[in-house]
Amino acid sequence: MSSSATVVPLAYQGNTSASVADWLNKGDNAWQLVAATVVGLQSVPGLVVLYGGVVKKKWAVNSAFMALYAFAAVWICWVTWAYNMSFGEKLLPIWGKARPALDQGLLVGRAALPATVHYRADGSVETAAVEPLYPMATVVYFQCVFAAITLILVAGSLLGRMSFLAWMIFVPLWLTFSYTVGAFSLWGGGFLFHWGVIDYCGGYVIHVSAGIAGFTAAYWVGPRAQKDRERFPPNNILFTLTGAGLLWMGWAGFNGGGPYAANSVASMAVLNTNICTAMSLIVWTCLDVIFFKKPSVVGAVQGMITGLVCITPAAGVVQGWAALVMGVLAGSIPWYTMMILHKRSKILQRVDDTLGVFHTHGVAGLLGGLLTGLFAEPTLCNLFLPVADSRGAFYGGAGGAQFGKQIAGGLFVVAWNVAVTSLICLAINLLVPLRMPDDKLEVGDDAVHGEEAYALWGDGEMYDVTKHGSDAAVAPVVV
């Protein structure tokens, strides 16, 4: 009887396999894939559940769906053109060249951010281009979930009144003309990256952008129905807490994935993230008790978010004591702007920012960026940043200049998002109304989607033909 040799597919032939290149670090690749996945879980189901629970019952479906749609739409835009606009070859000081990230040759090859090579004044290379020890597909995945969560955060300012069709148009336009500019300028090798502005993992690129863009879009869309704006208690605080918990734990991937490697910077970033977040939550809760005599669960969630946001631009470049200080400030300054200043300011009152994204992300993100300019520790900076001898003002030397860079970087992100978001909203409004008609605002989910979050069919509820339309009456469902 003849025998034949067993052929093992290349992918399973150990380290000699074509699927395991010499440059591949399996540990780094595994960590980066896990980090990307938990960041994705922050959005789906994290923010989907949080948005669905924190709004009024009649807007639960619409709010959750705005988040889900944005997550899906960003994926397609990202791999088709937006990834390379953010991290590809340089086109302009603020933009990379638009091209697809779908080719096998690109995706299975070693990851590289070509525009990140940093030169000294004499033209010699100071820092080589970022080249993680895993495939480009991993970087595309990791950065996509960051882009997606940014759009979902913008949605938080617009819940309860923006036309869904307008939102469908807004997502790809804002990703293309706003997010990619911030990402390339600060991370992908643009002018702020090479100037030395520090944004460890998205305080400016993600949170300031989302807070300012959301606030600006909310101005152009207009307010919710008056009765929705006057009183809107969460329809399900436990859902809100579930989404918040996914956010907090998912931030380990958010900030832990920032160095593109499973290294000591990642460990420091994850620890600092939890220190700052816990302190911010406690401070916010204490302020609620002192001024309003009651500890608020929703307030605690807001304090948690401001802590997460504030530490993000600094997580891998500050010491633990600085994370504690940042937590105190993250729990108090955004609390003041949201709970006190907002009620006194006519400008802030005029704009209906549904979930207060301007405060929890815009203010907290800018605060974190500025504090990074104070507390960035030189040794940690040298482990991560392309510009040598970067340090916060607290450490003397060039630290004062660093603080100035942080101010300038924040102002650029604010100005760009105000201008571009306004232009996008004005352009969309030429095609479709930005705001739902009043009759849909009165009803909510049932009028917009023909669905409700808590339709108790088993209790004998009748199918409402005045809302859905029907050829014949529908009998009650018996469960």
From Swiss-Prot:
UniProt KW keywords: Ammonia transport, Membrane, Transmembrane, Transmembrane helix, Transport
GO CC list: plasma membrane
**Source organism, top-level taxon:** Eukaryota
Provide the family line. Answer: Belongs to the ammonia transporter channel (TC 1.A.11.2) family.
| Chief subcellular location | membrane
Matches recorded under PANTHER family: AMMONIUM TRANSPORTER 3 MEMBER 2, AMMONIUM TRANSPORTER MEP2
- Recorded protein name is Ammonium transporter 3 member 2
- Provide the membrane topology annotation: Multi-pass membrane protein
Q: What is the lineage of its organism?
A: Eukaryota, Viridiplantae, Streptophyta, Embryophyta, Tracheophyta
One Pfam family in the UniProt entry: Ammonium_transp
Keyword presence, Ion transport = no
The residue ranges crossing the membrane are 34-54, 59-79, 139-159, 164-184, 202-222, 237-257, 272-292, 297-317, 321-341, 355-375, 407-427
Q: Which gene encodes it?
A: AMT3-2
Write one Gene Ontology MF term.
ammonium channel activity
Record function comment = Involved in ammonium transport.
**SUPFAM superfamilies linked:** Ammonium transporter
What does the entry give for GO biological process? ammonium transmembrane transport
Q: Where in the cell is it found?
A: Membrane
